[in-house]
A protein has these predicted regions:
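Hydrophobic structural elements of the Rossmann-like NAD(P)H-binding subdomain
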Residues: 70, 126, 173-176, 186
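Conserved Rossmann-fold SDR core element
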Residues: 154, 164-181, 219-223
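Canonical Rossmann dinucleotide-binding motif of NAD(H)/NADP(H)-dependent dehydrogenases/reductases
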Residues: 1-25
Length: 233
């Protein structure tokens, strides 16, 4: 079973290490080769756009597609913007950047895959989402751009699952909320978080892989936690 991992952040790197330890074939695509990852398994991906993804998928032009594609790309803050606490702080540029980082990669990946898949292709496309993007679970507000972009991701994944069910019935699509992790994404907010709620990505990685290995076709289009339990949309 071959794996393609998008994003070299905390969980993406942890997944690469875990897969290597399991002896699995993998390609890790991202902006910088992480320490401890075999360069032979790395593909430089500087931009999140269709052209870059097409270049990435030239790796598979003469080989079978990966059985599992895991998209870990996501954006909560950058050097110019932090999550909004009030509606007056919502900025159209930041909202667009959040959508491009959190919702677009899933669709761009799906488009590249769809051009190469057949009705018999067996493949799972998994994108990391967040309970913050759930309408049903939103009880605190704030983080407008992040929440809206993750909600858009969830809708895109659900819509894609319906399309693939007709075009590629052996393939599946899910979004997974892995929970809070001790990664650079959450570093600015450590003072607001209880230490015991932060998970080590090295411990999350095997749980995510085990979940993906246990999925059934009926679960395509689901939004799940690491235990495989459905989360509210």
């Amino acid at each position: 079973m071959g794996y393609l991992i998008l994003g070299c952040g905390g969980l993406g790197t942890a997944l690469a290490h875990e897969l290597s330890a399991r002896g699995e074939e993998l390609v890790l695509a991202g902006r910088q080769l992480p320490k401890g990852v075999d360069p032979a398994c790395y593909f430089p991906l500087q931009e999140v756009d269709a052209l870059s993804f097409d270049a990435l998928f030239t790796l598979y032009d003469t080989a079978a597609l990966p059985s599992v594609v895991i998209n870990t790309i996501g954006l909560l803050h950058d050097i110019n913007f932090m999550p909004e606490r009030r509606v007056e702080e919502v900025n159209p540029r930041w909202l667009c950047d959040s959508l491009l980082a959190n919702a677009w990669p899933h669709l761009a990946l799906a488009a590249c895959l769809s051009r190469r898949m057949t009705p018999d292709t067996r493949l799972w496309l998994c994108t990391l989402s967040d309970l913050a993007g759930s309408l049903g679970a939103n009880e605190t507000g704030s983080r407008y751009s992040y929440r809206m972009s993750k909600a858009a991701l969830n809708m895109g994944a659900k819509t894609l699952a319906h399309e693939w069910r007709e075009r590629f019935p052996a393939a599946g699509v899910i979004t997974v909320h892995p929970g809070l992790m001790d990664t650079p994404m959450n570093q600015p907010f450590l003072h607001e978080l209880a230490t015991e709620t932060l998970q080590d990505p090295a411990l999350v990685a095997p749980r995510l892989l085990d979940l993906l290995n246990q999925l059934s076709p009926a679960q395509s289009g689901s939004f799940l936690d690491l235990q495989g339990q459905p989360l509210p949309w």
